[in-house]
Amino acid sequence: MFLIAPEQVTANESLESFLIRLCKANGFESYQTMALVIRDWLQDNDHEAAGSWPLTLSRANIYHANHSSGFRVRAFKLLDELLDTNSPSMLERCLLNTTTAFSPNLASVSQRNIIIPLQFIRTLIIPVCPQCLTEHQYIPQLWHISPYEACHHHKCELITHCPSCNEPLNYLQAERMTHCECGYNLRLINTIKAPTVKKVISEYIAGKDVDCLPLRADMSERFGIILWYQNRYLHSKSDDDSSLISFFEHWPQSFFEELDDLSKTACDKQLKSFNKTDFSVVFGDVLASCQKLPFRTPQQNIVLEAVVDYLISLVEKNPICKVANLGDLKLNIIETATLLSTSIEQVYRLIEEGYLQLAIKLKLHSRLSPNQGAFYLRQAIELRQSRITPTYSNNMTYLPSW
């Protein structure tokens, strides 16, 4: 069996778009027709891989195959052998499952070592840029990512609905990239200039440096920054990102002012001693929400870096004294692990070896509850300051394994 590769093969094309063009280049009427032929060929060459081959285009990507992803990887590798091209492999186009999570425990996918929050992957509506479709008839992977709402090449808004039938656009259903299911030619649509905030976010996600957002070389970090902002400040789909630019233009001072307000409110409304008050009562999920974006160390996580800097300053401004202050707030084990840029297992080791003292008394043979305030903020900060975070690691190890 032999397959002719489509023309204009580029690295930024989505897997599904490439499969549609592969169908056309080889004379198949639909993806399902081609999928059945490929599955029959795989059955003769590797029956395990054949069983994992997707028959529906919308389920073709590897991240959809939770239990058979290994076999599907093998299937795509075999498919590469049928193509007469030196273009990027099928696996390079795939979105892969990954064990890396974004806080607070949000799933992610990976492509070419870039970690993307799963919630950013569009499934129902996949917008298009008519000008791009006029220049090249394929769908870039960027159009599948939800914060990308403006074409960074043409500075126009992406089109989400067909102007003829008003139905949402999704080329995975129609298996046509330049036309809607109703037959309307999407290349004829007049585009609208994108608002500044949409243009800036789209350029940022596309890898361009923009002055008003943090300059981070790692694309995974950029996705983490956008995700953190949306989860913290945008509480419904009707909210927009208009304040994002002004927020990060004054980073980290804008964030510090917010934390200062929380500190002041806690002091004004204090009901019990701070050494009996949980950190989350004063600052909410400020630590838990930035634990992994997707990295744990401040060098690769600007939000955690800002939080750590603020808390160090807070402890310095509130030295230990007879009356408990904000430096004596109680952290739970998850917050402590976040502040120390390490794992929960390492925190337990630090307790066992006496580096961390519990602020509470545990019953014999009992285990700490994840949400139970058990460590003083001051002590965790001092322990962190006593260690140097290695720049090559995504996780600090305070003690070697047993």
Residue ranges and their predicted role:
Residues 1-402:
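Basic, alpha-helical nucleic-acid-binding regions used in initiation and control of genome expression
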